[in-house]
């Protein structure tokens, strides 16, 4: 079923806007204090769209009513330490092109992917490290490297500060993992191997259980906080990346491989509600407007999927 109750609007990245901001000399990252980027000063008749480079995840900042887009940047073998964070207005216009990453002063952000906002912080996974930044200032506030991790993909942060993160891994099932990181920074492998199958998106359900979607199949897995498999549901398509769980238990799943979005209401089968969204990645839910906001990886764009009037 195509585009049920949805309208998709794509805001493409403008490469010229990104490239216009010069990089500081190598080795300058710790020489000066961190400085956040500032909002664009635009006239009423001017609107700027884009500014993304491999936008992998978006989180909704309800306090400022902005979308926080995490950009992985260039590949590490091309430009190391190139990740940055953009702020986007709900109409799709750019608020701050590079809020975190306008320069590299006091900043390490190599290749960030998944993100979450919790307890006044923006948390991101960055290869084998979880980093967090002050949501008011953008300033780096901490980092937890995890020994043995290879490349984290997504994360979710519980109210008590516990971090759950996925490692998608390789074709080796032993590399398919969900990690648990305590507020003290102690990391353990919570789940490993099947039924994980290239795990990607992760979220918490209303009961505090951990929900994970796989790239390798269409399974939607719910685990208890101690890692016990509770339920297995099926999305409409495999190749899944983005995951949103609403307070009523409804799940939305995006397929990065097939460009679709599915909805799974509690106790019901999955239904496709949108398609035609290339590389639909780690999305967020805008509770004010009842919409999904979906980054599109190397398409350097963000898609908005309207879910219709709230009931």
Name each model feature, range by range.
Residues 42, 129-160:
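Asp-box/WD-like beta-propeller blade repeats and closely related beta-sheet repeat scaffolds
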Residues 43-49, 94-106, 139-145, 186-193, ...:
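A short beta-strand motif characteristic of beta-propeller blades
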Residues 70-96:
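Beta-propeller domains
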Residues 24-43, 79, 83:
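Blade/loop signatures of beta-propeller domains
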Residues 52-64, 75, 103-122, 147-175, ...:
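Beta-rich, blade/repeat-based domains predominating
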Residues 83-86, 129-131, 176-179, 219-221, ...:
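A short loop-to-beta-strand structural motif that recurs across blades of beta-propeller domains
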Residues 88-93, 134-139, 181-186, 223-228, ...:
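Short loop/turn segments that connect beta-strands within beta-propeller blades
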Residues 2-19:
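Gram-negative bacterial Sec-dependent N-terminal signal peptides
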């Amino acid at each position: 079923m195509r585009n049920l109750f949805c309208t998709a609007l794509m805001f493409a990245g403008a490469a010229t806007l990104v490239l216009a901001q010069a990089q500081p000399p190598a080795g300058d990252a710790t020489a000066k204090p961190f400085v956040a980027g500032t909002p664009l000063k635009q006239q009423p008749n001017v609107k700027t769209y884009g500014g993304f480079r491999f936008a992998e995840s978006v989180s909704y900042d309800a306090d400022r009513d902005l979308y926080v887009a995490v950009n992985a940047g260039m590949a590490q073998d091309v430009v190391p330490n190139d990740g940055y964070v953009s702020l986007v207005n709900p109409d799709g216009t750019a608020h701050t092109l590079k809020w975190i990453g306008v320069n590299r002063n006091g900043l390490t952000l190599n290749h960030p992917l998944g993100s979450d906002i919790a307890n006044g912080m923006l948390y991101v996974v960055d290869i084998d490290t979880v980093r967090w930044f002050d949501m008011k200032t953008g300033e780096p506030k901490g980092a937890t490297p995890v020994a043995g991790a290879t490349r984290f993909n997504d994360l979710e942060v519980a109210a008590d500060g516990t971090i759950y993160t996925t490692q998608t891994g390789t074709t080796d099932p032993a590399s398919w993992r969900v990690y648990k990181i305590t507020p003290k920074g102690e990391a353990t492998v919570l789940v490993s191997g099947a039924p994980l199958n290239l795990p990607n998106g992760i979220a918490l359900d209303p009961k505090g259980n951990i929900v994970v979607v796989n790239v390798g199949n269409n399974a939607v897995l719910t685990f208890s906080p101690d890692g016990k498999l509770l339920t297995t549901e099926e999305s409409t398509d495999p190749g899944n990346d983005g995951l949103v769980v609403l307070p009523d238990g409804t799940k939305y799943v995006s397929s990065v491989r097939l460009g679709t979005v599915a909805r799974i209401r509690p106790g019901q089968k999955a239904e496709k509600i949108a398609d035609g969204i290339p590389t639909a990645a780690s999305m967020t839910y805008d509770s004010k407007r009842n919409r999904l906001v979906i980054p599109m990886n190397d398409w350097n764009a963000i898609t908005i999927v309207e879910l219709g009037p709230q009931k």
